[in-house]
Amino acid sequence: MVRILPIILSALSSKLVASTILHSSIHSVPSGGEIISAEDLKELEISGNSICVDNRCYPKIFEPRHDWQPILPGQELPGGLDIRINMDTGLKEAKLNDEKNVGDNGSHELIVSSEDMKASPGDYEFSSDFKEMRNIIDSNPTLSSQDIARLEDSFDRIMEFAHDYKHGYKIITHEFALLANLSLNENLPLTLRELSTRVITSCLRNNPPVVEFINESFPNFKSKIMAALSNLNDSNHRSSNILIKRYLSILNELPVTSEDLPIYSTVVLQNVYERNNKDKQLQIKVLELISKILKADMYENDDTNLILFKRNAENWSSNLQEWANEFQEMVQNKSIDELHTRTFFDTLYNLKKIFKSDITINKGFLNWLAQQCKARQSNLDNGLQERDTEQDSFDKKLIDSRHLIFGNPMAHRIKNFRDEL
């Protein structure tokens, strides 16, 4: 297991580090106001309806109020609560669901800032569609099922053009604040939020000006998506994985480094990955994002920068070995395509190269690697097909890595010496 460097631990508050590493919030005990330390967590005792640590006890069942309260280690949550990650502390909190948000008639209160409700400056092709959306939202304190149906129809019309290079840029530059608000609004049905995120994703794909606009004009958007991911994953909604995949797709389209995301993001991604273990497509999207973040933090062929990368990686994630295990397993999956094979292998390659013996490689991966070396060497020796230089380069890298990175470097040198004879 790769451990967090002591210098990093000293730079962070013990409360935040503990909440990040242990997947749960460490807060004041309601009755005594004392802080539960990380060591105390090892001695949690559950007795009846209480959880105790060194004679300090709190209820086993979380007792919600109308204001946000911290969720203590080991507590069980009643159904129907609002759950969030506190963006200032990184701690998980819950409160009673405000009855005014969802009425008996299935209406939804939509909280949209006045800034997002402002009409787009200047008319363009989709002004009328978004004007209709704003009128629906602005004229009703709550949204009925009919209102939601009309909003969905508007999204369907816009979706036809969102993938277009010019149209996508116009939509985002005029309407992104509203689209982002609708995508992240927890008071709306998932279907409507999913449509809004789909528009954003369609506009982002293969459209660098859109990527640049969002990245520069809305720098906090990525952190807000991570918080929404956490809340959505905790909701246990049967359709939440669809919206989770949309959120992950947006993050994968934007430039992301570890510094762009909250410190608890690696825990959120691990929880999403584990809870959706039957959804292989979703898990692939999580690993894509992990690969993207680690790659963005890395600078090749510079010892100083490699040291910095190692420090940043350990700071961002305390469980790099666990991610390495997932990459080893996923890269062996026969259902993934060559592009994902390259991406996940390269990530594992870099982790092993930098962290060396701190990253353990299992026998299953080594057996897979041996088989891949044989098959890819055969392809390299085959002169019957037109060469793909990018593919050839990766194949050679994989073959060399068997001994040079994942095995005995001396064996690599001996093999090369024999090949030259």
UniProtKB/Swiss-Prot annotation:
Gene3D superfamilies: Leucine-rich Repeat Variant (1.25.10.10). The keyword Ribosomal protein does not apply. Its main location: endoplasmic reticulum. Induction: By the unfolded protein response (UPR). Belongs to the SIL1 family. It is found in: Endoplasmic reticulum lumen. Present with 2420 molecules/cell in log phase SD medium. Glycans are attached at N105, N181, N215, N233, N315, N333. Required for protein translocation and folding in the endoplasmic reticulum (ER). Functions as a nucleotide exchange factor for the ER lumenal chaperone KAR2. GO terms for molecular function: adenyl-nucleotide exchange factor activity. Interacts with KAR2. N-glycosylated. Residues 1-19 form the signal peptide. One of its GO terms (cellular component) is endoplasmic reticulum lumen. InterPro entries: ARM-like, Sil1_fungi. This is Nucleotide exchange factor SIL1. Keywords: Endoplasmic reticulum, Glycoprotein, Protein transport, Signal, Translocation, Transport.
